[in-house]
Amino acid sequence: MRVIATIGEFRAARAAMHGAVGLVPTMGYLHEGHLSLVRRARAENDHVIVTIFVNPTQFGPSEDLSRYPRDLPRDLALLEAEKIDVVFAPNVAEMYPPGFGTFVDVGPIAAPLEGAARPGHFRGVATVVCKLFNITTPHRAYFGQKDAQQTLVIRRMTLDLNLPVEIIVCPIVREPDGLAMSSRNVYLNPKERRAATVLFRALQAVQERFRAGERNGDALRAAMRAVIDAEPLAHPDYVSIADLDDLHELDRVTSRALASLAVRIGTTRLIDNCILEA
């Protein structure tokens, strides 16, 4: 496994790869969710590239860029065990040199939910992913369903800019108690960690109501909110029942919908989602 920090050196390594190339973009501090993407990429491609880059342009001024967990030696050990071809781990100056000024604005799909709660977030995400696609030129790129809106943003960007990359979305990987795996879970103290299962419990509640025949959007949102309101440490940013294609809030679910939520547990903001299918 090669570890490369510069675009020039990476491009030389990429030129020597023949066959299908899969890309797994990450911000590091890897967990089993990331590794599930790596294994899927390994099964479907001749070569696998993992990028590790904590992207500053997707963090707001009051967000957790400075304390976002980082442990490159640990990440590299995990990836070595997965038999990855190349890890591309640039620094900020390599990705955003002096004078950098071009950003990708994806449009309406980036506006609601995470886009409303974190202004500028998806502008940063789309820009860095576009750059990584251009640098690594993969045939396929792998993302997790936990960041559902992000996957829609990246699909839209790839379509609109005619990027020759197949976007593959993989299932959420959960802890035994249902908490979606996230690098930010490390922020939680033991009491907060127990409370954090409220996100999964809220999704279970809305799925149960949906299976029982409830299709009213407000009633489904209320089912999630009731579970969150019963947890003293939980403070919701949003609960949503939205169209799976464009994320507009639904009055009534007629086919498929995305049930999603963002909740603060202490100072830690967590997200989760599930798909409701009629």
From Swiss-Prot:
GO terms for molecular function: ATP binding; pantoate-beta-alanine ligase activity. Catalyzes the condensation of pantoate with beta-alanine in an ATP-dependent reaction via a pantoyl-adenylate intermediate. This is Pantothenate synthetase. Belongs to the pantothenate synthetase family. (R)-pantoate binds at Q58, Q150. It comes from the Bacteria. HAMAP family: PanC. ATP binds at residues 27-34, 144-147, 173, 181-184. Gene3D superfamilies: HUPs, Pantoate-beta-alanine ligase, C-terminal domain. One of its GO terms (biological process) is pantothenate biosynthetic process. The reaction proceeds by a bi uni uni bi ping pong mechanism. It is found in: Cytoplasm. Keywords: ATP-binding, Cytoplasm, Ligase, Nucleotide-binding, Pantothenate biosynthesis. The active site is at H34. InterPro entries: Cyt_trans-like, Pantoate_ligase, Pantoate_ligase_C, Rossmann-like_a/b/a_fold. It comes from Roseiflexus castenholzii (strain DSM 13941 / HLO8).
